[in-house]
Amino acid sequence: QTGLDKKNLLRKTEPIEIVSDKMEAFQEKKMIIFSGNTVATQGDIKLKTDQLTIYYKDANQKKEKIGKQEIQTTGDLERIEAKGNVNVTQKEISATSEEAVYYQEDAKIIMTGNSVLKQGKNIIKGCKVIIYLDENRGDVQKCDAEKSGRVTAIIHPQDKKIKD
């Protein structure tokens, strides 16, 4: 178990605030790219990355105004891709990687490339971290056969103070 709170993580109905240096909208491709010091916040979850790409589903298109530009969106996310220096935090839990993809329909996040999951002092490292939001669990996997490396965990037992 990762300790991630599935009720708070990537809520479908709560808005996501995204701040970046640049935004490009591609209506025909149904995607929006945010780049440069990108920070996405939803509730108590914060994602920082170099570039964030949002992909929308085809059906039920509607127009939304973002700044002065009107873009066509569906409101339903297909997936969100984060590339470069990915850092996801929620309360005392953080996960870092080179890339991450959130699949809304499957309610999972796949983080790849030097993935590290931290909770308090505990640290788990691997090539891939998969977070299953509906199941409130996560898997950390080793690298492929052609790459070296295994899953590494550093667990700190909790200090229990004894009262005299």
Report the location of each language-model feature.
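Mature-chain termini and adjacent capping regions
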Residues: 1-164
